[in-house]
From Swiss-Prot:
Known function: Tyrosine kinase of the non-receptor type, involved in the IFN-alpha/beta/gamma signal pathway.
Entry's localization field: Endomembrane system
Higher taxonomy: Eukaryota, Metazoa, Chordata, Craniata, Vertebrata
GO cellular component: cytoskeleton; cytosol; endomembrane system; membrane
Binding positions for ATP per the UniProt entry: 881-889, 908
Co-factor binding details: Mn(2+) was used in the in vitro kinase assay but Mg(2+) is likely to be the in vivo cofactor.
Protein name: Tyrosine-protein kinase JAK1
One matching Pfam family: PK_Tyr_Ser-Thr
Keyword Hydrolase annotated: no
SMART domains: B41, SH2, TyrKc
Domain notes: Possesses two phosphotransferase domains. The second one probably contains the catalytic domain, while the presence of slight differences suggest a different role for domain 1. The protein kinase 1 domain is also called the pseudokinase domain and has a regulatory role through the transactivation of other JAK kinases associated with signaling receptors.
Gene label: jak1
Length: 1156
């Protein structure tokens, strides 16, 4: 190098050093108020000296300052305080006083790597496109949607990227060796080339001499500048010349020959910045303590403190990968090789191994669509994901926790749901207001029209959306019906109306009146007629609709599209087939809607068992059996199983599969230890804590949020369909619940059955079961939350079906808890407009918010329980007791506690084929037994009904000894005449009560007298019993039923008239049965058939009447005294008026007993 050149270079360097020292000695003036600085050189800072401003409002003003579109401004930018390394949440309020001194930077915070899509190994990033959603083919090389950034946003990002690169806010990656170090330096110089060229082109400077005019040092990181300064003059001189030559060659050949644009330079600069720097596109948070936990096994959270080396853990948030964490890596220190040594010593080798080991891989916690909500408590931020996994970060101060929550919340809105917030503490006021008003963000016109088409294109319906271009306008896109002159039919057209926003309020553009709020303006417009051109209509708002609605607000990637884009396959039935040999049916546990529930065992095979032919494992399961009598709803049953097959969630019960056994269809589901939630809650002697109840509610809401994301409808959300897997009463781990299958869907139930399920069924589904949707599950959740609050109490349990219908018709609400926020949450779930019900993600978030208030839930006053109303699911069948022509009687255990301590009862029901015809008779029997209470009449316990009351069952006391017809032959040796007379007295006493109440039994026989014990009998089976009027004294049979003719008096057979005395005749026949010990060979039917000869049908009655008119009667039984037989004959007088009554019979029998 020539000596003069070296001297000149030294003089220039000395001059620059003096200027630098002079600048450092300059005393800065203290700023006042709040300043927002921009990275664009021509944009002046914003200054505020008074009032209160939110970060979101300041961001909007910043976007307007640099001409960023509303679409990009709405969710990409935030305010940062560099001195504190802090981002402010959008709802943070800056209260500016005379003492305020805050300097903020307006920055793009939310960044997606590969948004420019040059890296083929990574997924490109784009805003959602309707064309792709509709299945329109897109070129694999071209964009799959609209670009992520507009021109102004790209310009600003480029300026921000330069700033971060030069000042080390985006530090270059650490080199692993000397070669890579030189490679990184060259890349930094390449960045300078791009920046200088962009500077020259944007300012219309000649490219040929730009290298001589501009120093590269202004465009490389400060750290690299310091490194270059430490080198000798000759090396720097060469360095400068090499750079100038490369810059000139790049501008003269590459730029001009390839027609490179400013846009290309920006994209190349930013894409290179992603690979050259470390951490671009992701934020790294270093908490004091990190806790990561999963809830499945109830284990405590995994606490991750600092290690022995003082290094803790770090959490990274990225727009493309979600949230992850790892142990902080050891700082990489570049060791320069000592050329005098041929080998490293063993200590160096060991050190290198340790360093490699410490470069830990990131562990994924969750993607954004898996997050349900975020909770802030002081300086701790806790993220909850589906399956109730949690990540808790204990940060150094509260603002850091809010900053972290705002980061995750912002990415969630960009990638999952543009109209939802995960955390109330950082919720943007614009999102909250949009939700309240049913207004969309700045979606484009195509999406507004798409939504209106989905809603049916009804005239006057409109979508509210913020303008994509103008921050001061809201657009109403309205459906207008016009006549198509060519096709002579009405067709929908879409008109846009503008709503102007200003400090005075809101007004429809072109009108004069401002309304203070958007909601008031919309309410005003609701009753108005709007006109446009020659059209006139009344506006009707279409709300935001279901969560995760597609729009151009969503940022998409090929490998991470929301589940809502993939429709569940419900049309194709799919479930695992279980062979009948693989299940063993156990005891009856109760009844569901048209199903019977049993315990059972499922035999499972392993891969080795396939060869051996055996089973290696047995699992306890629940069997839900749909009987052969319900084959008409088998398809609906299979659809439920197919839906459950698509589900995998720890808070939803596992469906093993379906077994077809003969004509029965069986759903095989996992056994859950503590059974239904409502029974569990009622069994607790000590009140359950509020925290316990909230944990159950959150788990249920999380499971339903999972179903909502998959667009699957449960359809029968209630506490008896929630199973308790872990009670959590000891405080360890808390409760753990599982949502069971919905059973038979309401779409195949009758209206009466649907009304019977109120208030769990949503009102719109009562009107038409085809309205069953996810919104119905939200109503069911609201009702279930009410049950949980009140310890399993049944809402509206004292209401009849008609009263329940009126409850809905009047749009009534259940009694609200004392806690105002909890009552508000229930109301939002149970609003009668299904479109206004909260999304389950919002429900999960709000439950946590209410829980933080630590409310006390006062139990409702316990209503008096009707002991005569039995719930069908608690009737556990043991065996059949008997069967007649019209019905049957079963022995069941009524076991509401589920611990096999319930009482045994007899359950009488009609056969399905006789249900329509005979139900009135069974109801009559129920009403009679309700009114009769006597020690010698079988006790009425109550009823249960299903199918909306169309199917009923009579619950009576169970008498294990059976009827006299069965009891007497078995115990003849132990029963003497006195015992028989005692039985006769008891029967007469019961019949006398019946007669005094103006009832006629009409079916008195030994088969209908039940034995309680060896000393007591009771009259049963009042199925044919009739009520008579006082002034008539008889009842005329008007139905053609099978009748016990051999026990009937002549007037019954001839005139079909029944008197009280007719029962006396039947008693005489019953007395004959007692005295013959119900011997089949001499039964009344056998004796009378012998008298009348072979016959059948109506001829039997005719011949029987003739025999009776001839005065023939049943003979005197063996061992019967003349006095006793004479008394029996008095029961068989041909004329009813001449027959003895029951009081007379009692007196005579009592005398006989006394004489024994």
């Amino acid at each position: 190098m020539p000596e003069l050149a070296v001297m000149e270079l030294g003089r220039q360097l000395c001059g620059k050093m003096k200027k630098q020292r002079k600048a450092e000695m300059t005393v800065l003036t203290v700023m006042k108020g709040l300043e927002i600085h921009f990275y664009l050189p021509d944009t002046h800072q914003l200054e505020y000296f008074k009032d209160c401003h939110t970060a979101e409002d300041l961001c909007v003003e910043g976007c307007q300052e640099d001409a960023t579109s509303h679409l990009c401004a709405d969710n990409l930018f935030a305010l940062s305080e560099e001195s504190q390394d802090l981002w402010y949440a959008p709802n943070h309020a800056f209260k500016i006083t005379e003492e305020t001194s805050i300097k903020l930077h307006y920055r793009m915070r939310f960044y997606f790597t590969n948004w420019h899509a040059p890296v083929r190994t990574e997924s490109p990033v784009w805003r959602h496109s309707l064309f792709k959603h509709k299945g329109v083919s897109v070129s694999p090389k071209g964009p799959e949607g609209t670009p992520l950034l507009d021109a102004a946003s790209l310009e600003y990002l480029f300026a921000q990227g330069q700033y971060d690169f030069l000042r080390g806010l985006a530090p270059v990656r650490a080199p692993q060796n000397e070669a890579e170090k030189h490679e990184i330096e060259n890349e930094c110089l390449g960045m300078a080339v791009l920046a200088i060229t962009h500077h020259a082109k944007s300012n219309d400077l000649p490219l040929s001499g730009v290298g001589a005019e501009t120093s590269y040092k202004r465009f490389i990181p400060d750290s690299l500048n310091r490194t270059i300064k430490q080198r000798n003059f000759s090396h720097v001189y060469v360095y400068n010349n090499v750079f100038k030559n490369f810059l000139n060659e790049f501008n003269s050949k590459t730029i001009q020959d390839s027609n490179i644009t400013l846009y290309d330079l920006k994209v190349k600069y930013l894409s290179t910045l992603e690979t050259l720097t470390q951490g671009l596109g992701r934020e790294t948070i270093e908490p004091k303590i990190l806790k990561v936990s999963g809830e499945s096994d109830g284990s405590p959270a995994l606490t991750l403190p600092s290690g022995d080396d003082g290094l803790g853990y770090e959490v990274q948030v990225s727009g493309t990968t979600g949230i992850s964490w790892r142990r902080k890596p050891v700082p990489n220190i570049l060791i320069v090789k000592d050329k005098t040594k041929s080998k490293k010593n063993k200590a160096d080798k060991q050190s290198k191994k340790e360093m490699t080991k410490r470069k830990t891989v990131m562990t994924i916690f969750s993607d954004f669509f898996e997050i349900t909500h975020i909770v802030i408590k002081e300086s701790c931020a806790t993220i909850y994901s589906q399956d109730n996994k949690t990540m808790e970060l204990d940060l150094f101060y509260r603002d850091a926790a809010l900053s972290f929550a705002a980061l995750v919340d912002g990415y969630f809105r960009l990638t999952v749901d543009a109209h939802h917030y995960l955390c109330t503490e950082v919720a943007p006021s614009s999102v909250v207001q949009n939700l309240e008003n049913g207004c969309h963000g700045p979606i484009c016109t195509e999406y507004a029209i798409h939504k209106l088409r989905q809603e049916g294109n009804e005239e006057g319906t409109y979508v509210l959306r913020w303008s994509c271009t103008d921050y001061n306008y809201i657009i109403m896109t309205v459906v207008c019906i016009e006549m198509d002159l060519c096709e002579s039919r009405p067709v929908p057209q879409y008109k846009n109306f503008q709503i102007e926003t200003s400090p005075q309020g809101y007004r429809l553009y072109g009108t004069d009146t401002f309304r203070p709020t958007l909601k008031e303006l919309l309410e005003h417009l609701q009753g108005q007629n709007l006109r446009t051109e020659n059209l006139r209509f009344q506006p009707v708002l279409v709300g935001l609709g279901q969560p995760r609605k597609i729009s151009n607000l969503l940022v998409m990637t090929r490998d991470r599209e929301p589940d809502s884009q993939r429709q569940p396959q419900v049309s194709q039935l799919s479930f695992h087939r279980i062979l009948k040999e693989e299940i063993v049916q156990g005891e009856h546990l109760g009844r569901g809607t048209r199903t019977n529930i049993y315990s059972g065992v499922l035999k499972l095979k392993s891969e080795d068992d396939d060869d051996m032919g055996g089973y290696s494992q047995e699992v306890k399961v629940i069997l839900k059996v749909l009987g052969s009598g319900h084959r008409d709803i088998s398809l609906a049953f299979f659809e439920t199983a197919s839906m459950m097959r698509q589900i995998s969630h720890k808070h939803i019960a596992l469906l093993y599969g379906v077994c077809v056994r003969h004509q029965e269809n069986i759903m095989v589901e996992e056994f859950v230890q503590y059974g239904p939630l409502d029974l569990f809650m009622r069994r607790q002697s000590i009140p359950l804590s509020t925290a316990w109840k909230f944990q159950v509610a959150k788990q249920l809401a999380g499971a339903l949020s999972y179903l909502e994301d998959k667009k699957l409808v449960h359809g029968n959300v209630c506490s008896k369909n929630i199973l308790v897997a872990r009670d959590g009463l000891d405080g360890e781990g808390g409760p753990f619940i599982k949502l069971s299958d919905p059973g038979i869907p309401i779409t195949v139930l009758s209206r009466e059955e649907c009304v019977d399920r109120l208030p769990w069924i949503a009102p719109e589904c009562v009107q038409d079961t085809a309205n069953l949707s996810i919104a119905a599950d939200k109503w069911g959740f609201g009702t279930t939350l009410w049950e949980i609050c009140y310890n399993g109490e049944i809402p509206l349990k004292d209401k009849k079906l008609t009263e329940k219908e009126r409850f809905y018709a009047a749009q009534c609400q259940l009694a609200s808890p004392d806690c105002e926020e909890l009552a508000k949450l229930m109301t939002h779930c149970m609003t009668y407009d299904p479109r206004q019900r909260l999304f389950f993600r919002a429900i999960v978030r709000d439950i946590d918010m209410v829980e933080k208030q630590n409310p006390s839930i006062q139990p409702v006053p316990m209503l008096e329980v009707d002991p005569t109303v039995f719930e069908k699911r608690f009737l556990k069948k043991i065996r059949d007791l008997g069967e007649g022509h019209f019905g049957k009687v079963e022995l069941c255990r009524y076991d509401p506690r589920g611990d096999r301590t319930g009482e045994l009862v007899a359950v009488k029901s009609l056969k399905p084929e006789n249900r329509e015809e005979q139900s009135s008779n069974l109801w009559r029997e129920i009403h009679i037994l309700r009114e009769l209470y006597h020690e010698n009449i079988v006790k009425y316990k109550g009823i249960w009904h299903e199918e909306g009351g169309r199917s009923i069952k009579l619950i009576m006391e169970f008498l294990p000894a059976g009827s006299l017809k069965e009891y007497l032959p078995r115990n003849k040796a132990h029963i003497d005449l006195k015992t028989l007379l005692n039985y006769a007295v008891q029967i007469c006493q019961g019949m006398d009560l019946l007669a005094s109440r103006n009832y006629i039994h009409r079916d008195l026989a030994a088969r209908n007298v039940l034995v309680e014990n060896e000393n007591t009998v009771k009259i049963g089976d009042f199925g044919l019993t009739k009520s008579i009027k006082d002034n008539e004294g008889y009842y005329t049979v008007k139905d053609d039923l099978d009748s016990p003719v051999f026990w009937y008096a002549p007037e019954c057979l001839i005139h079909c008239k029944f008197y009280r005395a007719s029962d006396v005749w039947s008693f005489g026949v019953t007395m004959y049965e007692l005295l013959t010990y119900c011997d089949i060979s001499c039964s009344p039917m056998s004796v009378f058939l012998t008298m009348i000869g072979p016959t059948h049908g109506q001829m039997t009655v005719t011949r029987l009447v003739k025999v009776l008119e001839e005065g023939k009667r049943l003979p005197k039984p063996d061992g019967c005294s003349d006095r006793l037989y004479c008394l029996m004959r008095r029961c068989w007088e041909a004329t009813p008026e001449k027959r003895i009554d029951f009081k007379g019979l009692i007196a005579n029998f009592q005398q006989m007993i006394d004489n024994q």
